[in-house]
Curated annotation (Swiss-Prot):
Family: Belongs to the monovalent cation:proton antiporter 1 (CPA1) transporter (TC 2.A.36) family. NhaP2 subfamily.
The keyword Cell inner membrane belongs to this UniProt entry's keyword annotation: yes
Protein name as it appears in the record: K(+)/H(+) antiporter NhaP2
PANTHER family from the UniProt entry: K(+)_H(+) ANTIPORTER NHAP2 (PTHR32507:SF7), NA(+)/H(+) ANTIPORTER 1 (PTHR32507)
Length: 580
C-alpha cells in the first residue's frame, strides 16, 4: 500500500465521519434515529452509490467488536447500580428466556418464509434475537422514561449478547457438522459464558479501579487507561470462552459506581469515543451491504421483521416478565415495542459468512433488513409510544453546566451552574430564604459580567448565574429549588392536585380528604401503603388507585418514597396539600 492510497483512505474516512456528524443534525428535525442516518451515509457511499467497494467481512467483524466494546464500557459507566433494585432480575429474564423465545418464534417463521430447514431458520432467529446496546443507549437517552422501564431495557441490552452469541455459534456448529440434536453440554457452555464474563468483568473492573486511583498520571491518561483496561478485559474474557460483551459492561459498571479519580474526564472522553465507535461501526456496516441485493427479499424480509416486532418480541416479554408483578401492562407493552435491533445482529450475521455456510449471504441480508426496519419503525416511533403508554415522568431541571472539583483523589464534589430566567420561582428571594439541600453551598453569584460578593440579604434577579457546590445526589433537590413555573405546572398535572409527604399517616390523610380506611391501619405511612399496593420496588411515576383517587410516586430518596401525588376525580378536588 503506497502513500497515495493511505492518504486517500484517510481522506475518505474523514469525509464519511464528518458527513455523518453533519447530516445527523437532521435526526431531530425528521424524527429519524441518528443511527439510521449514519447507516444511510454508509449505504449511499457504497457500491450502489459513491462506488466505494467494501466486502471485507473480517475487517467489519473487527471494527464491530471494537466499537461494541467501547459502547458497552461507556454504557456500564453511566448505569447506576441503584437501578438494579427494580430491574436486575427482570432484565436477566429478558436477556435469557426472552432471547430464546424470540429466537424460536422468529426462526420458525424464517424457515417457512424462505423454505429453509428448521436449524437454518433458528440460526436467523438467533442472529436477530438480541436487542442492541448501541441502539438502546443512543435512543433512550433524554427521553424521560421511568426508572423501571429505562433500567430494564438498558440492563437487558447490556447482558443479552451472551445468549445470542451462544445460540448463533451453537447453530453454526450444528450446520457445519450436520448435527441435528441438542445435548446438555450446551447448557454448561451457556453457564460458562455468563459465569466467566461476570467473574472477569467484576474482578477486572475492581483491579482497574485500584490502578486508576493509586497511580499518579497526567489527567489525560486516565481515560486512555480505562479504555485500554476495558478492551483488555473484553479480549481476555473472549480468549477463555466467556462473554466479552458482558465482561466489559460489568467492568464499566464497577468503575462508574465507585469513587474514581478523574471521573468527569473519563466520562467526557468515553462519551466522545462511544460516538466515534457508533459512527465508525454503522458506516462500515452501511458500506458492507449491497442495497440492490435487498430488493429480491424485501417482501418476505419485511414480513419476518413485522412478525418479530409484533408477535415474537411481545410474547417473549410477556413470558419473561410474568413472574414480576411490579410491571404494569403499559410498561410491558413499551418494553415489547423497544426491542431495538442494531449492530449486534449484523455482526453476528458475519459469523456464517466467515464459516462459509450455504445461504450465508441470505442470513446477512436478512439481518441488515430487519435492523433497518427495527430502527425506522421502532426507533422513530419511540417518543410517541412513550407518551401513548404513559411511561414518561417529568424530568428534573438540570444545571446549564457542571464540572468536577477534584479536591482529593476520589472526590465526588461538583460545581453546578444555574441561570435564573424570568420564570424561575426564586427570583426576588434573598439568599437566606433559599432552602438549600444539606451539604451544598453557593460558591459564586454572577450578575452580567460582574462577580458579586453576596450576603444572606442579596436578592436574586433575572439573568443571574448561580454557582453551587454539591454532589450528584443533590441535583433533584437543586432542580426543584431552581425550577421554572411551567415545570412546576407540569409536575402538578402529572403527579396530581396535591403532593403529600410520604411519611404522612393514612388516618390523617383520610380525615383531611374525607376518605374511607375500610379496615386499613390508620397509623400506616402513606409510602408503605403505596409499596404494598404496588407489589414491587417503587419508582417515580408508579400509580395506585384508592378510594377513587390516583396516588402517584412523586419523589424517591434511594429506595424510599419521599413524596406522593394525589389526583381526585374531576370536580371533587378537596382540601389543602403539601406541594413539591
Amino acid at each position: 500500500m503506497d502513500a497515495t492510497t493511505i492518504n486517500s483512505l484517510f481522506l475518505i474516512g474523514a469525509l464519511l465521519v464528518a458527513a455523518s456528524i453533519l447530516v445527523s443534525s437532521l435526526s431531530s428535525r425528521l424524527g429519524i434515529p441518528i443511527l439510521v442516518i449514519i447507516l444511510a451515509v454508509g449505504m449511499v457511499a457504497g457500491v450502489d452509490g459513491g462506488g466505494i467497494i467494501f466486502d471485507n467481512y473480517a475487517t467489519a467483524y473487527l471494527v464491530g467488536n471494537l466499537a461494541l466494546a467501547v459502547i458497552l464500557l461507556d454504557g456500564g459507566l453511566r448505569t447506576r447500580v441503584a437501578s438494579f433494585r427494580v430491574a436486575l432480575w427482570p432484565a436477566l429474564s429478558l436477556a435469557t428466556v426472552g432471547v430464546l423465545i424470540t429466537t424460536v418464534l422468529t426462526g420458525m417463521m424464517a424457515a417457512w418464509l424462505f423454505n429453509l430447514s428448521v436449524i437454518q431458520g433458528l440460526l436467523i432467529g438467533a442472529i436477530v434475537g438480541s436487542t442492541d446496546a448501541a441502539a438502546v443507549f443512543s435512543l433512550l437517552g433524554g427521553k424521560g422514561l421511568n426508572e423501571r422501564v429505562t433500567a430494564s431495557l438498558e440492563i437487558e441490552s447490556g447482558s443479552n449478547d451472551p445468549m445470542a452469541v451462544f445460540l448463533t455459534v451453537t447453530l453454526i456448529g450444528m450446520l457445519a457438522s450436520g448435527q441435528t440434536g441438542l445435548h446438555w453440554g450446551l447448557l454448561g457452555h451457556l453457564i460458562q459464558e455468563f459465569g466467566i464474563g461476570s467473574f472477569i468483568g467484576l474482578g477486572g473492573g475492581w483491579i482497574l479501579l485500584q490502578l486508576v486511583n493509586r497511580i499518579n498520571l497526567a489527567a489525560g491518561l486516565y481515560p486512555i487507561l480505562v479504555i485500554a483496561g476495558g478492551l483488555a478485559i473484553f479480549a481476555l474474557t473472549n480468549a477463555i470462552h466467556g462473554s466479552g460483551f458482558l465482561a466489559v459492561y460489568l467492568c464499566g459498571l464497577v468503575l462508574g459506581n465507585r469513587p474514581i479519580r478523574s471521573r468527569h474526564g473519563i466520562l467526557h472522553m468515553l462519551d466522545g469515543m462511544a460516538w466515534l465507535a457508533q459512527i465508525g461501526m454503522f458506516l462500515v456496516l452501511g458500506l458492507l451491504v449491497t442495497p440492490h441485493d435487498l430488493l429480491p427479499i424485501a417482501i418476505p424480509a419485511l414480513g419476518l421483521a413485522l412478525w418479530m416486532i409484533l408477535v415474537a418480541r411481545p410474547l417473549s416479554v410477556m413470558v419473561g416478565l410474568l413472574p414480576f408483578k411490579a410491571f404494569h401492562d403499559r410498561e410491558k407493552a413499551f418494553i415489547a415495542w423497544v426491542g431495538l435491533r442494531g449492530a449486534v445482529p449484523i455482526i453476528l450475521a458475519v459469523f456464517p459468512l466467515m464459516a462459509g455456510l450455504p445461504n450465508a449471504q441470505l442470513y446477512f441480508n436478512l439481518a441488515f433488513f430487519i435492523v433497518l426496519v427495527s430502527l425506522l419503525l421502532q426507533g422513530t416511533s419511540l417518543p410517541w409510544m412513550a407518551k401513548l403508554l404513559k411511561v414518561t415522568v417529568p424530568p428534573d431541571p438540570a444545571p446549564i453546566s457542571r464540572a468536577a472539583l477534584e479536591v482529593h483523589v476520589t472526590s465526588e464534589w461538583e460545581l453546578f451552574v444555574y441561570r435564573l430566567g424570568a420564570e424561575k420561582w426564586c427570583i426576588g428571594a434573598a439568599l437566606r430564604e433559599l432552602k438549600m439541600p444539606e451539604g451544598t453551598r453557593i460558591a459564586a453569584l454572577f450578575r452580567g459580567q460582574q462577580l458579586l460578593h453576596p450576603s444572606g440579604s442579596t436578592t436574586l434577579e433575572v439573568g443571574d448565574l448561580l454557582c453551587v457546590i454539591g454532589h450528584e445526589h443533590d441535583l433533584p433537590a437543586l432542580g426543584k429549588l431552581f425550577s421554572q413555573a411551567p415545570q412546576r405546572g407540569l409536575d402538578l398535572r402529572f403527579f396530581g392536585d396535591f403532593v403529600l409527604e410520604g411519611d404522612a399517616r393514612l388516618g390523617e390523610v383520610a380525615a383531611l380528604y374525607g376518605l374511607k380506611l375500610d379496615g386499613i391501619d390508620p397509623g400506616m405511612p402513606l409510602s408503605q401503603f403505596i409499596v404494598q399496593k404496588n407489589r414491587g420496588e417503587p419508582v417515580v411515576g408508579d400509580q395506585v388507585e384508592w378510594n377513587g383517587t390516583i396516588w402517584t410516586v412523586a419523589v424517591m430518596d434511594g429506595n424510599k418514597i419521599q413524596k406522593v401525588g394525589v389526583k381526585f376525580p374531576e370536580g371533587t378536588r378537596p382540601g389543602p396539600g403539601l406541594f413539591l
